[in-house]
Amino acid sequence: KIYTFILSACLLLVCSACHEASHHLLLGGSGWDKIAIVNKNTKEIEWEHPLEKGWECNSVAVTPDRNILFSYSKGAKLITRDHEEVWNISAPEGCEMQTARVLSNGNYLLAWCGNPATIMEVNAKGEILSKTDFDTRIEQPHAQFRQVNKNKRGNYLVPLFATSEIREISPSGQLLKSVKVDGNPFSVAALDNCNYLVACGDAHCFIELNFETGDIVR
């Protein structure tokens, strides 16, 4: 069985005793039974955390204090490297927690698919700082989204599977803009040139998107 690993796997810079940076990848994926840190040089798993059968981990991130944040369909957890649970936020029955990421201000962004779908920002203690409910207009939660992101304007970018589009949603839940793309967009990340890199899921490609004009640059 071929597993689909998270396309936006985190690249960690870990300093060794001789102060030389070595590259590691934090990996997770729908259908895999663990999340793991892999040494890119040796190709060996240096740390892993088991996942229960049926958990769908589509987002995983390292926090500034080196803890591990991940979504698992039924919720999102923050754990230590010693596998101790710091907090666990559950998704409502019938919903799917698909996003768990670290924001630039040190807080965390969580999002679950549902009717309505919900985006939350929480702090390191798991306290909810803000909550945004919005209607994707997609009936099946599993067909909605995977990795929501936040742009520099403070709005949320939601890549939608079923409708093949990227939507910009305000913190109040208002739809501000929508851009159509190829495939089933999985993740969207800002580039230095202000465009966005979009992982297009089953289209098996990445695109560079100018979200303001809707043009696919490449």
Spans of features found by a protein language model:
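Short intrinsically disordered, low-complexity coil segments enriched in acidic
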Residues: 1-5, 216-217
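Bacterial Sec-dependent signal peptides at the C-terminal "C-region" and cleavage site
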Residues: 3, 7-22
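Secretory-pathway ectodomains
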Residues: 21-218
